[in-house]
Amino acid sequence: MEVNKKQLADIFGASIRTIQNWQEQGMPVLRGGGKGNEVLYDSAAVIKWYAERDAEIENEKLRREVEELLQASETDLQPGTIEYERHRLTRAQADAQELKNARDSAEVVETAFCTFVLSRIAGEIASILDGIPLSVQRRFPELENRHVDFLKRDIIKAMNKAAALDELIPGLLSEYIEQSG
């Protein structure tokens, strides 16, 4: 049902100023407004908006109350009591769920996955490196074998580094954690 500002104020038992404030807060307008044009509202859309807004306000109040209770109760908990252990378990479950959600949304990945991916890429790089000496020898037949052998030795070193990547990652991860923590 289309209603004007006055009718909407009567529906909610609020003042016209309150309706204007709600409009500034994002209450949906059907049409109108501007100089001399009456603003019209869809009462169903406004009621839906009001209910959602009211629920958000109430949820925020409850969140704050729960947070205050948690902070107060954390300081009151005594290690070894069942309440303390229950609180620790709840916190651990919440942390685990947050980590699972982060993993499901690909915000974090497991170290084993990183090791797998990097090892796979390193293997592909190693196979490309392996073909370089032969390609250079074909492209530049005037090169002496000692030059090609020198190139092979350095490429073998790089291939060995790439092949050992899966063994290096856990150590590098520990080093990273130490430096960033």
UniProtKB/Swiss-Prot annotation:
Gene3D superfamilies: Winged helix-like DNA-binding domain superfamily/Winged helix DNA-binding domain (1.10.10.10). It comes from the Bacteria. To phage lambda DNA packaging protein NU1. InterPro entries: DNA-bd_dom_put_sf, Phage_lambda_Nu1_terminase-ssu, WH-like_DNA-bd_sf. The lineage of its organism: Bacteria, Pseudomonadati, Pseudomonadota, Gammaproteobacteria, Enterobacterales. The gene is nohD. Encoded by the cryptic lambdoid prophage DLP12. This is DNA-packaging protein NU1 homolog. It holds the Pfam family Phage_Nu1. It comes from Escherichia coli (strain K12).
